[in-house]
Curated annotation (Swiss-Prot):
It is an enzyme of class 3 (hydrolase). Belongs to the peptidase S9B family. DPPIV subfamily. Residues 53-799 are lumenal. GO terms for cellular component: plasma membrane. This is Dipeptidyl peptidase family member 1. Keywords: Aminopeptidase, Cell membrane, Disulfide bond, Glycoprotein, Hydrolase, Membrane, Protease, Serine protease, Signal-anchor, Transmembrane, Transmembrane helix. Disulfide bonds join 474-477, 482-500, 689-794.
Length: 799
């Protein structure tokens, strides 16, 4: 029973007893003293245990869980209309921006995914269908298409018109699928040119000419083991980043689609637990792990809308008997003809083959082969943005420069099956991350690059008219507060929408790519100004950011980003505060990017009055292959060393501000693996505590595609196993958190770790989340609360 309850009980007894007249001043004084002591204790507790859900606390701002959503930029997926207006997705639904003013054109209902047709006459609404076992491969949805009629009266306020629509039920809705409202759809794709579409149901692709038309055309013949138009788990997670495996041609008259055979791929089994269900539900899905003998095999087909015929393509690779991943698919105009380009890579992802596919012959002829130098690899990012101009293709390859090599734009002139060597654009020493496209009138190519600094992401242009000189021009550099930019272009590459993610409040600019102002800078203006959002970010009191480059060896530097609560940084007398090292450390990751970063670590640090340190060392991206290659074949080694070295330097440089006796490390997924590895490799008691969420404990337990990309054909003995060296956890407190339904990093990893910690007699904290996957997204509040309580105990209570 609490102290407050005890006090109230006693107080009630005094009021109701027969001896109230016998109370003297001493008794009253004692009661008052007790009450005052309780009030002091409550006040002290409020100061010490900063509430997670209070907006402000005693004069200084504290971030809370709700800020994770309210401070997130509310706009995404921008697209141009025919009259140069801009359509975008927002929390509320689909909005259109005209002359700097936005209005809602289609509202979001119950969090449904909304996809507009090419002319925005129709909107597809996708609501998730029941999935009792929560199987990631069984995710389906109910699909409705709404006829979004033209405005009834342009003079009416939009909200009034929306109310009228609801009352009059003026919008016509169409249920899509073989069984209409009873159908569960696996994937859906509008034609980018017209209002027709395709969808996948029961592993087969179907075509419908318009929402109003009842007739369906079956495009493919998938079944129980052959799946058409969809990617399996490993392709969705590690290569394409999406579920559908369908590509409409630009003209809208052909559809390319991928198919795979899954009956030989091994399954992983997870369990879900439901109230009043006597038995758990088993969830089985295909997940080939490292060293797996069988990987999913994919084929590529084209369906012709005019003839209503499908043809499986004969992909002519030199080593056709070996296993190949499908890496990229894109329709491109080559010499005035639209053709399908497909890119393939070997199992270890260090060789690529590019083919051009023809409908008439049903052949994909080999046009380009490339073998990567030692300790280098290909990713989907290098070819997903492939583009063309006349008879030349442009994509990303490593370009050797002095003592380094950078991912840069390579051009390949096609020669009908005669293999040629690509040439590189004349660029500086920086990594190009993606190609946006080419303005064919001005012969200008646009791309994103990690420049002018490695921690930046900027939009560049480059003139193909004179490739003898470096004509690269940074477009987004002239936009204020835009060190981390993401751009979307119109079809003619004359206008760009640039989403600026930092370093301050995110915002969006619209850029005229064909005109320069008086300072020879590209003309730009705000797409829209969301004053409410801007004020919210400014009032949030985001931490002060310190960025440094520190030496960790003769050949390598580490980039660091130190975040300090603003009220602490501005104090006259600095008192050393705890430090939370937020680590990820995975291949090609950038943790010190100059963007506004507001994650759960910011909320926890705010509640704990601690600083956050992020570090990029060897293995990180943005600084060429010299850094990327360093971890090849040895995950969990040099990147761990660099983190520990950098922490030591930072603690020395900022010893007036950071308390070296109160250092915690926190990481999720690969970061969870890094957290455990760093505690193992650091000096004893270097870390006071550690939080590891959903960690990999040995990459032999992880998926083959990811692991073998970075480990190659290294034997099992070369794999780091964090469970082999756990003695430091006897002096470093550990909080281990994992979802039991994690389909990405299986709980198997934590189970093996738990077993070994118990064998060694290590005391640790454990929090498991039933029915929760890798992100624990529906348990964010609980995760933050548990982490905050754990770290506050570590920093302020434990000795």
């Amino acid at each position: 029973m609490t102290a407050e309850a005890d006090l109230l009980e006693g107080y009630d007894e005094e009021l109701g007893g027969n001896e109230s007249q016998k109370r003297d001043c001493k008794g009253i004084t004692t009661a008052i003293v007790v009450v005052l002591l309780i009030l002091v204790m409550i006040f002290a507790a409020l100061v010490f245990f900063t509430p997670l859900f209070a907006a402000k606390s005693f004069g200084s701002w504290r971030l809370n869980v709700s800020d994770l959503r309210s401070l997130r930029y509310p706009y995404a997926e921008f697209a141009f209309t025919d009259n140069n207006a801009v359509v975008m997705q927002s929390w509320e639904g689909v909005e259109i921006v005209e002359d700097g003013v936005s209005r809602l054109i289609f509202g979001r209902e119950n969090g449904a995914e909304i996809t507009p047709s090419a002319d925005r006459k129709y909107f597809a609404m996708m609501d998730h269908a029941p999935n009792p076992g929560m199987n990631p491969q069984n995710e389906t949805f109910h699909l409705k298409i709404v006829n979004n009629n033209e405005r009834l009266n342009p003079l009416l306020p939009f909200e009034v018109e929306e109310l009228f629509r609801e009352l009059s039920d003026s919008r016509i809705t169409y249920d899509i699928g073989l069984r209409k409202e009873e159908s569960v759809i696996q994937a859906f794709k509008w034609n980018g040119k017209f209002n027709d579409f395709v969808f996948v149901e029961s592993n087969k692709i179907y075509y419908q000419s318009s929402p109003e038309e009842e007739g369906l055309t079956r495009v493919s013949n998938g079944g129980e083991h052959t799946v058409d138009g969809l990617f399996d788990w490993i392709y969705e997670e590690e290569i394409f980043g999406r579920k559908d495996a369908m590509w409409w041609s630009t003209k809208g008259d052909q559809l390319a689609y991928a198919s795979y055979d899954n009956h030989l791929t091994k399954n992983v089994s997870l369990k879900t637990y439901h109230r009043l269900e006597p038995y758990p539900i088993d969830t089985n899905f295909h997940y080939p792990k490292t060293f797996a003998k069988v990987l999913p095999t994919y084929t590529l087909s084209i369906w012709n809308k005019k003839t209503e015929q499908s043809r499986q393509l004969d992909v002519q690779l030199k080593d056709s008997l070996s296993y190949h991943y499908l890496l990229a698919v894109k329709w491109l105009e080559i010499n005035g003809t639209e053709q399908l380009v497909s890119v393939w890579t070997n199992r270890y992802q260090n060789e690529v083959a590019l083919t051009i596919c023809d409908w008439d012959t049903a052949i994909c002829r080999l046009e380009f082969e490339y073998k990567y130098a030692s300790k280098r690899w290909v990713t989907h990012d290098d070819f997903h943005s492939i583009t063309s101009f006349e008879d030349t293709l442009f994509f990303l390859l490593p370009h050797d420069k002095r003592d380094n090599a950078f991912q840069q734009v390579a051009s390949l002139r096609l020669s009908h099956g005669q293999l040629r060597t690509p040439k590189f654009l004349n660029l500086g020493e920086y990594d190009v991350t993606s190609i946006n496209g080419i303005n064919k009138e001005t012969r200008t190519i646009f791309f994103h690059a990690a420049a002018p600094k490695p921690s930046h992401r900027s939009l560049f242009s480059y003139s193909l008219a004179d490739e003898s000189r470096n004509s690269a021009y940074c477009i987004s550099c002239s936009i204020k507060n835009c060190t981390w930019a993401q751009a979307q272009m119109d079809d003619q590459m004359k206008t760009a929408i640039v989403s600026c993610k930092g370093p301050a409040a995110p915002h969006t600019a619209i850029v005229n790519l064909t005109r320069m102002d008086s300072d020879k800078k590209t003309e730009h203006a705000n797409l829209l100004y969301d004053k409410t959002y801007q004020n919210r970010v400014e009032e949030a009191g985001l931490p002060v950011i310190i960025k440094e480059t520190i030496k960790i060896s003769d050949d390598f530097d580490a980039l660091i980003k130190l975040s300090i609560p603003k009220d602490i940084y501005n104090r006259d007398k600095h008192q050393a505060i705890p430090l939370i090292v937020h680590v990820y450390g995975g291949p090609n990751d950038q943790n010190t990017k100059e963007a506004t970063q507001i994650g759960i670590e910011e909320v926890v640090a705010s509640a704990s009055q601690a600083a956050i340190l992020r570090i990029d060392g060897r293995g990180s991206g943005g600084r060429g292959w010299k850094y990327r290659s360093a971890i090849y074949g040895q995950l969990g080694t040099v990147e761990v060393e660099d983190q520990i070295k950098a922490i030591k330097v930072v603690l020395r440089l900022y010893r007036h501000l950071l308390d070296a006796r109160r250092v915690a490390v926190f990481g999720w997924s690969y970061g969870g693996f890094m957290t455990l590895s760093m505690v193992n490799e650091a000096p004893e008691q270097f870390f006071k505590c550690a939080v590891s969420v959903a960690p990999v404990t040995n990459f032999a337990y992880y998926d083959a595609t990811y692991t073998e990309r970075y480990m190659g054909d290294a034997p099992l003995e070369s794999y780091s196993d964090v469970t082999k060296k756990l003695d430091n956890f006897k002096s470093t407190r550990l909080l281990l958190m994992h979802g039991l339904l994690d389909d990405n990093v299986h709980f198997q990893n934590s189970a093996i770790l738990i077993d070994e910690l118990q064998n060694r007699g290590v005391d640790f904290d454990l929090m498991v989340y039933p029915n929760q996957a890798h992100s624990l997204s529906s348990r964010t509040s609980h995760v933050v609360g548990k982490m905050t309580h754990f770290l506050r105990q570590c920093f302020y209570t434990d000795k």
